[in-house]
């Protein structure tokens, strides 16, 4: 468990030690009507909103990294979700990375989060608000066992399941990425109300947080949506395949060269980065 905790901490701070990308040189949102451009893993945003860091319902972690920008739809989703969580007595929602002022590629830690439509939310719901020191150096709570096959019972709670369900039931949300073991536990706990599980997708890591993705806004004409998740609750063979050992000869995919930016994003960089 100690090694896992160290790995999680390294994941959350890794970006601080890497070389900056051109997008990090843009320190304020680009003026204009809100437009998410390109794909979640290759895009940018014009007219991003700033998530207010002061709220009774949520707290923003690592504000020194300045990753609390997003499309107005994302800001409203966070406010909506955290209000619902407070109404139900779940606790304070802890907000992690959203995007940079103009979106674009991070220097580490994320492949997506580029169009202002993604947010990481800790799977912790403290009843006592965190101090500024805790928020600047958050301690991730690993919910998954060392073998990756199930959640840790002492760390899992119905409140966490309720938070994920609330997010999945939001009409603007298209996908929520969690660790396969977390998805498995949600499948076990869901009962007969299972429609929302379709949006909850198993993915690597994501042992302590959920990654919520919104659909492209209707007026963002250059935004590229993903196909909808497959029909059904996703609790069958697809989920179980995540727990099977790798097939013989399986190797890690080679790191790909980033594709060219959408023309509108390249033009934005050319105009705002010297």
UniProtKB/Swiss-Prot annotation:
<dbReference type="InterPro" id="IPR009045">
    <property type="entry name" value="Hedgehog_sig/DD-Pept_Zn-bd_sf"/>
</dbReference>
<keyword id="KW-0862">Zinc</keyword>
<feature type="disulfide bond">
    <location>
        <begin position="44"/>
        <end position="265"/>
    </location>
</feature>
<keyword id="KW-0479">Metal-binding</keyword>
<dbReference type="GO" id="GO:0030288">
    <property type="term" value="C:outer membrane-bounded periplasmic space"/>
</dbReference>
<dbReference type="GO" id="GO:0004222">
    <property type="term" value="F:metalloendopeptidase activity"/>
</dbReference>
<feature type="binding site">
    <location>
        <position position="120"/>
    </location>
    <ligand>
        <name>Zn(2+) 1</name>
    </ligand>
</feature>
<feature type="binding site">
    <location>
        <position position="150"/>
    </location>
    <ligand>
        <name>Zn(2+) 2</name>
    </ligand>
</feature>
<comment type="subunit">
    <text>Dimer.</text>
</comment>
<feature type="disulfide bond">
    <location>
        <begin position="187"/>
        <end position="235"/>
    </location>
</feature>
<feature type="binding site">
    <location>
        <position position="211"/>
    </location>
    <ligand>
        <name>Zn(2+) 1</name>
    </ligand>
</feature>
<protein>
    <recommendedName>
        <fullName>Penicillin-insensitive murein endopeptidase</fullName>
        <ecNumber>3.4.24.-</ecNumber>
    </recommendedName>
</protein>
<dbReference type="GO" id="GO:0006508">
    <property type="term" value="P:proteolysis"/>
</dbReference>
<dbReference type="Pfam" id="PF03411">
    <property type="entry name" value="Peptidase_M74"/>
</dbReference>
<keyword id="KW-1015">Disulfide bond</keyword>
<feature type="binding site">
    <location>
        <position position="113"/>
    </location>
    <ligand>
        <name>Zn(2+) 1</name>
    </ligand>
</feature>
<feature type="binding site">
    <location>
        <position position="110"/>
    </location>
    <ligand>
        <name>Zn(2+) 1</name>
    </ligand>
</feature>
<dbReference type="GO" id="GO:0004252">
    <property type="term" value="F:serine-type endopeptidase activity"/>
</dbReference>
<feature type="disulfide bond">
    <location>
        <begin position="216"/>
        <end position="223"/>
    </location>
</feature>
<dbReference type="InterPro" id="IPR005073">
    <property type="entry name" value="Peptidase_M74"/>
</dbReference>
<comment type="similarity">
    <text>Belongs to the peptidase M74 family.</text>
</comment>
<keyword id="KW-0482">Metalloprotease</keyword>
<dbReference type="GO" id="GO:0000270">
    <property type="term" value="P:peptidoglycan metabolic process"/>
</dbReference>
<keyword id="KW-0732">Signal</keyword>
<feature type="signal peptide">
    <location>
        <begin position="1"/>
        <end position="19"/>
    </location>
</feature>
<dbReference type="GO" id="GO:0046872">
    <property type="term" value="F:metal ion binding"/>
</dbReference>
<feature type="binding site">
    <location>
        <position position="147"/>
    </location>
    <ligand>
        <name>Zn(2+) 2</name>
    </ligand>
</feature>
<keyword id="KW-0645">Protease</keyword>
<keyword id="KW-0378">Hydrolase</keyword>
<feature type="region of interest" description="Disordered">
    <location>
        <begin position="225"/>
        <end position="274"/>
    </location>
</feature>
<keyword id="KW-0574">Periplasm</keyword>
<comment type="function">
    <text>Murein endopeptidase that cleaves the D-alanyl-meso-2,6-diamino-pimelyl amide bond that connects peptidoglycan strands. Likely plays a role in the removal of murein from the sacculus.</text>
</comment>
């Amino acid at each position: 468990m100690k090694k896992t905790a160290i790995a999680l901490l390294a994941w959350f701070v890794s970006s601080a030690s890497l070389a900056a990308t051109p997008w990090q040189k843009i320190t304020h949102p680009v003026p204009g009507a809100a437009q998410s451009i390109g794909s979640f893993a290759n895009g940018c945003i014009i007219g991003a909103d700033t998530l207010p860091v002061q709220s009774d319902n949520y707290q923003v972690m690592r504000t020194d990294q300045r990753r609390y920008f997003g499309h107005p739809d994302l800001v409203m989703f966070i406010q909506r979700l955290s209000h619902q969580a407070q109404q139900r007595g779940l606790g304070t929602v802890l907000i992690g990375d959203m995007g940079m002022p103009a979106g674009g590629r991070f220097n580490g830690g994320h492949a997506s989060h580029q169009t202002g439509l993604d947010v990481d939310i800790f799977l912790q719901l403290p009843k006592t608000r965190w101090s500024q020191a805790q928020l600047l150096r958050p301690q991730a709570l690993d919910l998954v066992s060392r073998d990756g096959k199930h959640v840790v019972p002492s760390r899992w709670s119905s409140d966490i399941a309720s938070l994920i369900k609330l997010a999945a039931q939001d009409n603007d949300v298209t996908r929520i990425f969690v660790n396969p073991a977390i998805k498995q536990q949600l499948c076990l706990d869901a009962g007969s109300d299972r429609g929302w599980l379709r949006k909850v997708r198993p993915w690597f890591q994501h042992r302590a947080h959920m990654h919520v993705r919104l659909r492209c806004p209707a007026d963002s004409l250059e935004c590229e949506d993903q196909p909808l998740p497959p029909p059904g609750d996703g609790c069958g063979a697809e989920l179980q395949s995540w727990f099977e050992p790798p097939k013989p000869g399986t190797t890690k995919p080679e790191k790909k060269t980033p594709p060219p930016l959408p023309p509108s994003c390249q033009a934005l960089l050319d105009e705002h980065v010297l």
